Swiss-Prot record:
The keyword Ion transport applies. NCBIfam families: PRK04192.1. It catalyses: ATP + H2O + 4 H(+)(in) = ADP + phosphate + 5 H(+)(out). This is V-type ATP synthase alpha chain. Keywords: ATP synthesis, ATP-binding, Hydrogen ion transport, Ion transport, Nucleotide-binding, Translocase, Transport. The gene is atpA. GO terms for molecular function: ATP binding; proton-transporting ATP synthase activity, rotational mechanism; proton-transporting ATPase activity, rotational mechanism. Produces ATP from ADP in the presence of a proton gradient across the membrane. The V-type alpha chain is a catalytic subunit. Belongs to the ATPase alpha/beta chains family. HAMAP family: ATP_synth_A_arch. GO terms for biological process: proton motive force-driven plasma membrane ATP synthesis; proton transmembrane transport. It is an enzyme of class 7 (translocase). It holds the Pfam family ATP-synt_ab.
């Protein structure tokens, strides 16, 4: 039998429709409450999604084969919650926060009705006591800390405790398991409370204590096209829509490896199973370029593949953001990668159809936009009571059918995010990786980033705008060349076209398989961008289009070689010197 609270409300199945059950209830229940359905000597986890009189509709998170009319249903009395505490990092969970490595020990395939603790109860943690007897604390205040990898994991007063608590007893510093009572307290009403290292929080409610503040720190990801053309601030939101095969998942894998954040929560809610396996095989062997440790030391993975029931997709995306919010409350910078929010939206559409709700555009529920907005609004930078700041940056991959950016999920996402990184099938087919199309992408953070970088790089904002103008003009001239040929345009237009192509090939594109070019530090980007602007501001003298193309191809080859050399090495400095000499040989004037 499953563990439930003292409330023992029960019911029985009246009707089953896929994973949606209609249940007659004998007692009090509430929407969002967890229920367990009896089938074949096991219990399947479910959630109440609609209450009508003495009947409720529940969505079951697992395969419902074998459920019959009259099957017993038990209601737990608590909402769908995440278990939060030390030990989540390096964890690999399913959408219900079961540890997959533990389930793998019991069976090759996931058995339905098997649930395990998200946090290991046997692991011993070195606990350092911070609170003192007599101190008055409230939700989110620190009781003590444990060392989780390189992070000081704060053991906090549970966020479900909305009253002030006077501490009456604290444990001494030492080695304890997570279920050890580390402090006791008394509320103003006289209620006695005991605190362990673990707390629970409903995943569909925002997890926040503190003041939301404007984002003011750049999130360096090592991709020049993102850091320069479509920058994102820590605490910002952005999306990566693109058709099948455009490189959304590869882009998200790059972000999880190289983004300058403390912790990455990777939520694979609808990825193909093979891509999830690739993550699990690669990440333990990859090194974090910022710390030199394994990438798994800063990563938490929620794997919910397309082959799992649709209801679990919704729980997995909310579970991921709840874990991310929990670590943000410790003053850490978090990146949540959701791949893909379209699969979540499809799950909403399927459940909405079974509930017989009035459909919206393309049969998605009418509340789709508000659900997506509520999800992205849980991101942001937060200032805690102790003055520390944490941030949660959200990146959602969107998979529009046929690459149609006008479909409802993409449009609902674009209305709430701060940056749009549109992936193009045409660029992917042309092997222009990363296949982010700078012509359709945008960022609301450009001016903020320019303001931050103004002291270090004067005129950064204007330089980025100039580069964008060259890309736009070059694209227009390229279309004319396809019609009338190179002989039908002026030499000045030919020069603009070749400069835009040079910028695209040598700056916006990167080689993910090159040890140096796969990750470009910000200082290196600034130097390379300075070189590109020097080329933009220079006028050259050519006799004919062929000579111009030959010169820019030679220049492109040398800059590409430079990108593959170790930054500030002797070879790098020599290569840079050769490039500037080559420019001087053809330069007429500098603007």
């Amino acid at each position: 039998m499953v563990a439930t609270s003292k409330q023992t409300t029960q019911g029985y199945v009246v009707e089953a429709y896929g994973n949606l059950l209609r249940v007659h209830v004998d007692g009090h229940v509430r929407q969002g409450e967890v229920a367990y359905v009896s089938v074949d000597d096991t219990w399947l986890k479910a959630e109440i999604i609609e209450v009508v009189g003495d009947e409720v509709k529940i969505q079951v998170f697992e395969e419902t084969q074998g459920i019959s009319r009259g099957a017993l249903v038990t209601f737990s009395g608590h909402l769908l919650e995440a278990e939060l505490g030390p030990g989540l990092l390096q964890g690999i969970f399913d959408g219900l926060q079961n540890r997959l490595e533990i389930l793998a020990d019991t069976s090759l395939f996931l058995r339905r009705g098997e649930y395990v603790n998200a946090i290991c109860r046997e692991t011993v943690w070195a606990y350092t006591q911070k609170a003192s007897v007599g101190s008055v604390l409230s939700r989110g205040d620190v009781l003590g800390t444990v060392k989780e990898g390189r992070f000081d994991h704060k053991i906090m007063v549970p966020f479900s405790c909305f009253e002030e608590v006077t501490i009456t007893w604290v444990i001494s510093s030492g080695n304890y398991t997570v279920d050890t009572v580390v402090a006791k307290g008394r509320t103003s009403t006289g209620e006695e409370l005991e605190f362990t290292m673990v707390q629970k929080w409903p995943i569909k409610q925002a997890f926040l204590e503190g003041e939301k503040v404007p984002s003011h720190e750049i999130m360096d990801v090592g991709l020049r096209v993102l850091d320069t053309q479509i920058p994102v601030l820590k605490g910002g939101t952005f999306c990566t829509p693109g058709p099948f095969g455009a490189g959304k998942t590869v882009l998200q894998h790059h972000l999880s490896k190289y983004a300058a954040v403390d912790i990455v929560v990777l939520c694979a809610c609808g990825e193909r199973a093979g891509e999830v396996v690739e993550i699990l095989q690669e990440f333990p062997h990859l090194t974090d370029p910022h710390t030199g440790q394994s990438l798994m030391h800063r990563t938490c993975i929620i794997c919910n593949t397309s082959s799992m029931p649709v209801a679990a997709r919704e729980s997995s995306i909310y579970l991921g953001i709840t874990i991310a919010e929990y670590y943000r409350q410790m003053g850490l910078h978090i990146l949540l990668l959701a791949d893909s929010t379209s699969r979540w939206a499809q799950a909403l559409r399927e459940i909405s159809g079974r509930l017989e709700e009035i459909p919206g555009e393309e049969a998605f529920p009418a509340y789709l936009a508000s659900r997506i907005a509520a999800f992205y609004e849980r991101g942001g930078a937060v200032k805690m009571k102790d003055g520390s700041e944490g941030s949660l940056t959200i990146c959602g991959a969107v998979s529009p059918a046929g690459g149609n950016f006008e479909e409802p999920v993409t449009q609902a996402t674009l209305s709430v995010v701060g940056a749009f990184c549109g992936l193009s099938k045409a660029r992917a087919d042309a092997r222009r990786y990363p296949s982010i199309d700078p012509m359709i992408s945008w960022s609301k953070y450009l001016d903020s980033v320019a303001e931050i970088l103004e002291k270090k790089v004067p005129g950064w904002g204007e330089s980025v705008k100039q580069a964008s103008r060259f890309l736009e003009e070059g694209a227009e001239i390229g279309k004319r060349i396809e019609v009338v040929g190179e002989e039908g345009i002026s030499m000045e237009d030919m020069e603009i076209f070749l400069k835009s192509e040079l910028y695209d090939f040598c700056y916006l594109q990167q080689n993910a398989f090159d040890a140096e070019d796969c990750y470009c530090p910000f200082d290196r980007q600034i130097e390379l961008f300075s070189l590109m602007n020097h080329i933009f501001n220079s006028r050259f003298c050519f006799d004919c289009p062929d000579n111009a193309r030959s010169f820019f191809l030679e220049l492109q080859s040398k800059i590409k070689t430079l990108n593959g050399q170790k930054f500030l090495s002797e070879e790098y400095q020599k290569g840079l010197e050769v490039i500037y000499k080559l420019l001087e040989s053809k330069m007429v004037q500098t603007v």
